[in-house]
Amino acid sequence: FTCLAGPMSFVLLLFAEHAMAKEPVCGRVLCGGRGVPGVVVTDGERFTQTDSHGAYRLVCGENAMHVYISVPAGYTVPVAESAPMFWIRVDTLAVREGIDFTLLREPDKGRRHRFVAMGDPQVRNRRELSQLDSLLAALKRTVAQLPASSEIPVLVAGDIVFNRPKMHLPSKKSFAVLGRPVFYAIGNHDHGPIRDSETPANEEPATRRFREHYGPTYYSFNRGRVH
């Protein structure tokens, strides 16, 4: 009996931790204080949809870092330092209190839409950041000339920085000058140092810095009839 006490306690402890990890996350998806039905909510592995009142309940996987939504057509989301806030980290206090997501209505439901796509800013230092700033200022002037029928998001197709994780925050702040949502995709140079991204086993630590700044590495959103 004495010999089994330690292992049994250890097993019970593991069971308790496992049970805590499986605690469901609950909340609502709201627009103007009203629940939005049918919105997909996920942790990247498991999915659910909001009910007729905009409420959801999701049991997250043990390795989940975010809970996030697939922004439905006809809506956009608030922006923080250029990053669309369709996600929240699961290690925040808000998880225990419930995670609510805010949607903003598009004027024309996004049926007529444009977007700007760019790739490989690959910022390494402050000098290159200033070059990016000049490009973004020109881009802002160009976008301002387009008809303002709906929100015009920007898509950055990877390699935001060039193997310099410390440049993610200043780069994200630079993109904020555009005053519109910037959807980021991860590129090979956005991982940790090159040596840390050569094997699948290093994928999680190599992408963690990106996910801390921009949210999940894969996600979706809807514009008009396009997913």
For the regions a protein language model found, what residue spans apply to each?
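Bacterial N-terminal signal peptides
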Residues: 2-14
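Beta-strand-rich domain onsets/edges
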Residues: 13-24
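Short, ordered, surface-exposed loop/turn motifs in non-cytosolic proteins
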Residues: 22-45, 62-63
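N-terminal active-site segment of His-dependent metallophosphoesterases
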Residues: 24, 81-168
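Conserved catalytic scaffold of divalent metal-dependent phosphoesterases
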Residues: 31, 86, 99-108, 121-124, ...
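Short, acidic Ser/Thr/Gly-rich low-complexity loop/linker segments typical of extracellular
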Residues: 42-60
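A short, solvent-exposed loop/turn motif at the edges and junctions
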Residues: 43, 64-89
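Extended active-site neighborhood of metal-dependent phosphoesterases/phosphodiesterases
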Residues: 73-79, 166-227
